[in-house]
């Protein structure tokens, strides 16, 4: 530690001297949740609890403190105390402008400044008295300190919250390594500048640590065969955490981020902790399966502004529901048996912690559960159970003293004890001044008899003097713990200039003392209480008991989520429909479709269901059309992050790491008959990230929407997006450079592949293994034809360039995307077996597409290229059926061949045509029921089925819309009737707030966030 502990001011150390032995007696002691000791006693000696219970032995040297009427609890433990100050770090921090990894690294630090697992949070720690005072005022006596920035942020520490001194440190090497999904922005050249990149860097760093450990083991055993590995203090520290099974504490901003952390923890066998976010109630089952300890904030949303109907338009149903459910998050987690501790973190005003906690208790969160979440639970997981968390013999004397039940709104926290030292916070007056008093007072020869009426709160009384000539409001009223009572009045009503001050002592119903006029004349006074305070309604507002939300969580949460997850019937029979098989049978009129256990069983006439079937659905589709589910070969929906634009080659990043299964676009696209989508990385990179093929299973978590068994793919890009000026001077800046970047990457991948093979064969484990590189792993998969390339492309010269590169390196191009000059070189595309996924009739949206024509698709199809139409848009994906109709218009093509452009053809391009794309026996039961011909702009999608499960139904949608409308009105009325303070949010100045799982739409057309 670098001298971080400031010396204690000698003037503040008097309470460090005698006495060191205390006897606290007469209190109601709550030694742990669920236990109460009435009129109990605690002996504290040298900072430790010597005894606790009823009628304990009284040490002769103890200083006795009478706590009659008080409650004593274990001191609270803050599990997530953020250390903000990092200026004195001895390594570069933040983003480094246009510097390569080797240029920013020191000899032993990690190349990326956001990776600092070797950092100890106390290296640059400065504890501000205001910070500790704020926490002590809430009853906290201990804190788990965590670093605030970076990706691998460093090791935590445990401290006491008393006066800062070397003895305040409980454990300098705390129990957790803190991790955050931190990244820059598009204007920032440093890696990573996206969530995609942050996750990839986390994974690569863990693999680096594994390799580093293995490399040193081999080197130490066989130094004669190997060069000494470069020392890396970051990886050394990370390996220590891994070997000690320390916790890895991931900070999460929403509930799906918790599941993302769970995938990383599963991959690397981590002891997972989560810093929560308040949205956990949305995915409780999945979060429970993580078996993680969660540090939970009480950051309830402010009351939405719905005061006018115009303002209410800016508030989504998701926001309204979150406002109603969020205060029950802790209760619902407790009911699921998920272990958690509560934190003041994320609160702008720390004082609101207790208010929010009591609000949760008021709504149904158990008092014992609430108390456990700030005492025994954090103590258990932070490794402090032997010394803190309960009031027991031998434990550190960290405790909290209140003037009543902590969970009573009127109760005040009077003091905390930290290591056996008392920190007075505020005192509750022993006497109660409220009531009506007859007061006699005299100065000089004048004697007066008036009435004094004291009302208000016990600790904050107010009142008035009722004299014969006037009723005079008291200017101030005070009452202290030693029964000293004081008040003042303006003297002008009594023909006295200035303020007249009174003070005295209350004993039961009698009070007496003296006053002082502005002229220093002494006033003698005495008073007798003749009536208690009646708690007039004007003085004391009756509090309405708040009830827990009655809303049922939807999947996903929001307006169109499902209250019950969809189930798959055993048998589905669609009768009397016009069926577009998209297979050899073509279009069949007045036919039936039979589905069993999620698979197409038969297409034919007069099909039937056995009467013994337990679960079946029969649909009369007379006059309707049934098609395979539509497939979008180029989408950017359902992802939190699309482009890692900091480098030209980012093959290590994966869309599957950032899937957003709660994206409302999924539901909207289901309503257009879409069932499968190829979610691609953006187009800012010569070699971008790995794709994710999904099925639009609305309501399932991210893992649940992945298309099982779909071939792996990756996004490439050519042209303006890759080399344009927006790339911040990043190489390449010309179209020639793009080719060289791609060739250079594959040359490195070939060398990497060869090294992997030679090292595995060489010298029987006596050579240091090749470091696993996630970027090169993906490129090797391409070389091995295990990963398809999907390439953003427009111009014929660039398309031909990539064709030649693919031939040189022997990899497979799955599709050229956009490919608007593909009609010029269709034969070359067909020759290598690549597909073309294009737009129907888009052109002139930038100069690069100046030669685009609407006949492009049909012309390539005629040349033997497998062609599909895609959306590259969350909106256009809702009507790909009418995009297919344009193929018939510009073809000319048959209706069936045109519809192939959005069904079987994209399935072929993605390598999933054995499962989807046509209605044939054995394939997945992904189908759509249309009101009419699917190529007609007048036809409507009525039902969308995936794997024999209904995910969209037009009739159900109408019912949901009505229910949502009614629910919205009810929530708005609840907000308007709420006693909660009005929000200061100005809807019209800032626009509508987005929920945690809402993301902006991306399109490859310009490569920008639209």
Model-derived features: positions:
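Histidine-rich, glycine-flanked metal-binding segment
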Residues: 6-9, 14-20, 29, 33-75, ...
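Polyanionic/metal-chelating signatures
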Residues: 127-281, 412, 418, 505, ...
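Tryptophan-anchored aromatic micro-motifs
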Residues: 24-27, 429-450, 461-469, 511-521, ...
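C-terminal cap of metal-dependent C-N hydrolases
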Residues: 27, 396-429, 577, 921-964
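Edge beta-strand at a domain terminus
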Residues: 4, 407, 476, 507-558
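Central antiparallel beta-sheet cores of small beta-barrel/beta-sandwich binding domains
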Residues: 439-506
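His/Asp/Glu-enriched, well-ordered alpha-helical/loop segment
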Residues: 18, 88-89, 96-110, 118, ...
């Amino acid at each position: 530690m670098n001298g971080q502990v400031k010396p204690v001011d000698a003037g503040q150390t008097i309470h460090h001297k005698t006495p060191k032995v205390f006897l606290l007696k007469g209190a109601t002691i709550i030694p742990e949740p669920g236990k109460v000791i009435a009129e109990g006693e605690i002996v504290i000696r040298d900072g430790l609890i010597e005894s606790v219970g009823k009628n304990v032995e009284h040490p002769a040297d103890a200083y006795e403190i009478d706590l009659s009427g008080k409650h004593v609890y274990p001191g609270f433990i803050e599990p997530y105390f953020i250390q903000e100050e990092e200026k004195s770090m001895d390594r570069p921090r933040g983003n480094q402008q246009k510097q390569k990894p080797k240029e920013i690294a020191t000899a032993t630090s990690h190349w990326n400044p956001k990776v600092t697992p070797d950092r100890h949070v106390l290296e640059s720690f400065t504890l501000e008295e205001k910070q500790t005072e704020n926490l002590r005022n809430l009853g906290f006596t201990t804190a788990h300190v965590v670093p605030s920035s970076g990706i691998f942020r460093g090791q935590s520490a445990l401290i006491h919250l008393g006066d800062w001194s070397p003895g305040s440190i409980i454990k300098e090497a705390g129990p957790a390594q803190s991790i955050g999904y931190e990244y820059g922005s598009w204007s920032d050249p440093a890696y990573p500048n996206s969530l995609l990149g942050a996750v990839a860097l986390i994974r690569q760093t863990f693999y680096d640590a594994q390799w580093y450990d293995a490399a040193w083991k081999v080197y130490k055993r066989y130094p004669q065969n190997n060069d000494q590995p470069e020392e890396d203090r970051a990886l050394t520290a990370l390996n220590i955490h891994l070997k000690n099974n320390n916790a890895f504490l991931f900070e999460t901003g929403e509930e799906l981020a918790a599941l993302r952390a769970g995938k990383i923890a599963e991959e690397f066998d981590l002891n997972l902790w989560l810093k929560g976010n308040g949205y956990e109630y949305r995915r409780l089952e999945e979060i429970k399966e993580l078996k993680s300890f969660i540090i939970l904030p009480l950051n309830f949303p402010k009351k939405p502004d719905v005061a006018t109907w115009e303002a209410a338009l800016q508030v989504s149903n998701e926001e309204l529901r979150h406002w109603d459910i969020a205060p029950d998050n802790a209760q619902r987690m407790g009911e699921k048996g998920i272990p958690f501790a509560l934190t003041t973190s994320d609160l702008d005003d720390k004082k609101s912690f207790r208010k929010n906690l009591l609000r949760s208790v008021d709504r149904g969160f158990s008092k014992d559960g609430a108390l456990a979440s700030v005492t025994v639970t954090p103590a258990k997981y932070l490794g402090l159970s032997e010394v803190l968390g309960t009031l027991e013999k031998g434990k550190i004397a960290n405790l909290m003293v209140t003037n009543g039940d902590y969970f009573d709104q009127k109760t005040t926290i009077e003091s905390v004890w930290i290591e056996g030292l008392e920190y007075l916070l505020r005192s509750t007056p022993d006497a109660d001044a409220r009531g009506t008093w007859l007061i006699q007072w005299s100065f000089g020869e004048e004697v007066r008899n008036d009435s004094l009426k004291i009302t208000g709160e016990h600790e904050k009384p107010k009142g008035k003097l009722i004299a014969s000539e006037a009723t005079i409001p008291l200017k101030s009223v005070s009452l202290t713990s030693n029964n000293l009572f004081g008040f003042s009045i303006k003297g002008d009503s009594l023909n006295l200039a200035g303020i007249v001050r009174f003070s005295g002592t209350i004993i039961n119903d009698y009070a007496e003392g003296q006053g002082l006029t502005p002229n220093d004349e002494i006033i003698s006074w005495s008073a007798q209480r003749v009536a208690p305070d009646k708690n007039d309604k004007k003085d004391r507002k009756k509090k309405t008991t708040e009830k827990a939300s009655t809303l049922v969580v939807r999947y996903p949460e929001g307006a169109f989520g499902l209250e019950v997850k969809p189930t798959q019937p055993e048998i589905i029979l669609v009768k009397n429909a016009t069926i577009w098989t998209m297979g050899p049978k073509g279009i069949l009129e007045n036919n039936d479709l039979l589905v069993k256990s999620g698979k197409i069983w038969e297409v034919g006439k007069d099909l039937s269901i056995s009467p013994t079937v337990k679960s079946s659905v029969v649909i009369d589709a007379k006059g309707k059309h049934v098609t395979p589910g539509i497939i979008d070969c180029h989408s950017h929906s359902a992802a939190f992050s699309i482009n890692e634009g900091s480098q030209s080659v980012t093959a290590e990043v994966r869309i599957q790491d950032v899937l957003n299964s709660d994206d409302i676009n999924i539901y909207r696209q289901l309503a257009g008959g879409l069932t499968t989508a190829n979610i691609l990385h953006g187009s800012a990179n010569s070699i971008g990230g790995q794709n994710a093929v999904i099925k639009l299973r609305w309501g399932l978590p991210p893992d649940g929407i992945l298309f099982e068994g779909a071939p792996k793919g990756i996004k490439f890009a050519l042209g303006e997006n890759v080399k344009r000026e927006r790339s911040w001077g990043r190489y390449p800046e010309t179209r020639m450079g793009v080719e060289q970047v791609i060739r250079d990457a594959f040359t490195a991948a070939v060398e990497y592949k060869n090294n992997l093979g030679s090292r595995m064969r060489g010298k029987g484990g006596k050579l240091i293994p090749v470091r696993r590189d996630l970027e090169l792993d993906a490129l090797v998969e391409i070389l091995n034809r295990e990963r398809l390339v999907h390439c953003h492309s427009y111009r014929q010269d660039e398309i031909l360039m990539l064709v030649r590169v693919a031939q040189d390196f022997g990899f497979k191009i799955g599709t050229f995307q956009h490919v608007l000059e593909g009609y010029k070189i269709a034969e070359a595309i067909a020759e290598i077996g690549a597909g073309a996924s294009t737009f129907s009739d888009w052109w002139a949206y930038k100069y690069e597409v100046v030669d685009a024509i609407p006949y492009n698709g049909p012309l390539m199809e005629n040349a033997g290229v497998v062609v599909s139409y895609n959306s590259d848009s969350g909106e256009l994906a809702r009507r790909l059926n009418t995009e297919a109709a344009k193929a018939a218009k510009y073809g000319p093509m048959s209706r069936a061949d045109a519809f192939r452009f959005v069904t079987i053809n994209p399935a072929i391009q993605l390598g999933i045509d054995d499962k989807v794309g046509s209605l044939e026996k054995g394939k997945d039961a992904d189908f759509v029921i249309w009101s009419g011909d699917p190529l007609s702009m007048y036809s409507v999608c009525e039902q969308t089925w995936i794997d024999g499960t209904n995910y969209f139904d037009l009739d159900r949608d109408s019912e949901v819309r009505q229910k949502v409308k009614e629910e919205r009105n009810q929530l708005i009325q609840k907000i308007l009737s709420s006693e909660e303070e009005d929000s200061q949010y100005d809807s019209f100045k800032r626009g509508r707030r987005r929920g945690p799982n809402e993301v902006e739409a991306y399109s490859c057309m310009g490569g920008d966030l639209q």
